[in-house]
């Protein structure tokens, strides 16, 4: 096991290149199951979730080659092998295998998702969609069993706006007979990205990115080449790090419109940000930052995935800021870790209340989930002294070459193997 050390206080300066979107990649890769010939996806992030998906596609008979961010999948010899246990449990987005395998094979057995523990992440909307298309769905011993004689298009209204359910229903519906309409669909950029891939494969999809998506089922889908969109959450994390510690940081390979909610909040605090077609410039180091209230919402609102890094930055603001997470109420495990570093904050219901300004101090902290890890990295950059972060398996699930990118901007950051004594202490904590 390893820990991440950060010697805080270094100014960040320069350009950072953003990787492909994790939240797109975990849906694009299962979508390749639906094709009848080779699919190439370019620009994938080199993170553990992608390697897990590669292994799962191989497990069901796919021929998969992945290097330098490019994955080539030949799905022709895939079979509808049950995946109730093993690697599938490591992956929160393993549920996309349900929609893709149901779409192609009319059956699937998928172990219930793993990944970050952020309170209940029910998949009832996914199941509602599959049932509407004609599937029989049962939950047996922690795995979802899906079976269908045939899939027929349906009108599906999502009770909750859900990115996962919207994509999963799209995956299952593209090869169904007739027309499917998804109402109250999520509008995230990642949904448009998946729809773009499916359309390149021959699917007929209209309305991706709006709240009504229309799909006309087709008989088969063919291979294609697709380039993934940039990761708006990684870009947002570096914007926050640049705001916290930057002189001038340029975020390269980004779609600025995907980050308007964060850009607006940083400007409200007093930061100077410039945008171009595929870059953002953020000027850090401002004094007398204003406190702001942040409320997470579905896209185009403030992303829940940036709520945690934002709480670290708000320790710099003079006054009281309130961060409310309307998406995942349990996403405040990072608050106790920030308090170990000297932050003045508390949790009330779905909100974190942050009072500043406070000079954070280096400490030993633990990442409980992916974005909590990002928050602690930002806090470590800001802190006086050395911060030791454990729980790196969470960070490695979602950030590609994080230390290398931060080092390139001037941070002092390194990994170390943990001693047996440290591992024992961690396991007992």
Swiss-Prot record:
One of its GO terms (cellular component) is cytoplasm. InterPro entries: Enolpyruvate_Tfrase_dom, Enolpyruvate_Tfrase_sf, MurA_subfamily, RNA3'P_cycl/enolpyr_Trfase_a/b, UDP_GlcNAc_COvinyl_MurA. Pathway: Cell wall biogenesis; peptidoglycan biosynthesis. Phosphoenolpyruvate binds at residues 22-23. Its main location: cytoplasm. One of its GO terms (biological process) is regulation of cell shape. UDP-N-acetyl-alpha-D-glucosamine binds at residues 92, 121-125, 305, 327. The active site is at residue 116. Its EC number is 2.5.1.7. One of its GO terms (molecular function) is UDP-N-acetylglucosamine 1-carboxyvinyltransferase activity. It is found in: Cytoplasm. HAMAP family: MurA. Belongs to the EPSP synthase family. MurA subfamily. Cell wall formation. Adds enolpyruvyl to UDP-N-acetylglucosamine. PANTHER family: UDP-N-ACETYLGLUCOSAMINE 1-CARBOXYVINYLTRANSFERASE, UDP-N-ACETYLGLUCOSAMINE 1-CARBOXYVINYLTRANSFERASE 2. This is UDP-N-acetylglucosamine 1-carboxyvinyltransferase 2. It comes from Bacillus subtilis (strain 168). The gene is murAB.
